[in-house]
A protein has these predicted regions:
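Glycine- and charge-rich intrinsically disordered segments
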Residues: 1
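Structured alpha/beta reader/binder surfaces that contact nucleic acids or chromatin modification marks
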Residues: 4-132
Length: 132
């Protein structure tokens, strides 16, 4: 099963655990934190994986989880290596965003913009950015 975008290209997808995938769909989470960088920039679909993250109840109460489905699309516009100053700035200026990720110097902040909800599509997730 493949999804094609408006240009006829196969789409790129990133699997993210709930509640974080739904928080992206709701435009509450705009930065995905990862241990690795990516050179990819462009349209990216978000897949809510089957496994749930261990998070505080405050975040879980905000969403209706949609496990095992592609739930929204966005644009991956940048990938920033986190420094101590970057982490401090996010914690001070964006406290909700800070709660939605693992912010540590040496990790990467994937910057997401232009989020659009889509009709959910069942899919089996994969690691890294994958084609669907």
């Amino acid at each position: 099963y493949l999804i094609y975008n408006d240009k006829g290209d196969i789409v790129k997808v990133l699997s993210i655990r709930e509640p974080y995938a739904s928080l992206i769909k709701m435009k509450i989470k705009t930065i995905e934190t990862r241990s690795f960088k990516t050179n990819y920039r462009g349209e990216l679909y978000i897949h809510a994986s089957l496994s749930k993250s261990n998070v505080d109840d405050e975040l879980s109460k905000l969403v209706m989880p949609m496990y095992g489905k592609i739930i929204c699309k966005c644009k991956l516009v940048d990938c920033v290596l986190m420094t101590e100053n970057y982490v401090k700035e996010i914690k001070e200026k964006m406290p909700m965003e800070y709660k939605c990720g693992l912010y540590e110097a040496g990790r990467y902040a994937w910057i997401l913009e232009s989020v659009e909800e889509i009709d959910a599509i069942e899919a089996k997730g994969k690691l890294g950015i994958w084609n669907f």
